[in-house]
C-alpha cells in the first residue's frame, strides 16, 4: 500500500465525513474505492501523470478527486487528496 501522509489522511477523512452527512453508505463506498485505488499505486507507482508541482504525480482516483503523490524508492507517498474543482497548487 502507498504511504499516506498526515495531510492526505485528513483530506480523505474530510471527504468521507462530508459525503456521510447526506449519504453514509456512499461515504463508505467512496472510502473503499479510494483504498482500492491505493492497490493500483502499490503495483504501478508511476501510473499517474506528472504533477503540477515539481517532484509530484497526480492520479484521478475518482472523477471528483485527484491524488497528489510522489514516488520515493519505488513507494508511492500520497501527499494530498483534492476535489477536482479545488485550485491546486494553492495560489
Regions flagged by a language model, labelled:
Residues 56, 64-66:
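Short hydrophobic/aromatic beta-strand or adjacent loop that forms the aromatic wall/cage
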Amino acid at each position: 500500500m502507498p504511504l499516506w501522509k498526515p495531510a492526505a489522511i485528513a483530506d480523505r477523512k474530510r471527504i468521507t465525513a462530508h459525503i456521510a452527512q447526506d449519504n453514509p453508505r456512499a461515504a463508505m463506498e467512496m472510502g473503499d474505492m479510494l483504498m482500492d485505488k491505493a492497490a493500483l499505486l502499490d503495483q504501478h507507482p508511476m501510473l499517474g501523470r506528472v504533477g503540477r508541482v515539481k517532484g509530484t504525480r497526480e492520479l484521478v482516483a475518482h472523477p471528483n478527486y485527484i491524488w497528489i503523490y510522489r514516488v520515493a524508492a519505488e513507494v508511492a507517498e500520497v501527499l494530498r487528496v483534492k476535489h477536482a474543482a479545488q485550485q491546486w497548487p494553492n495560489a
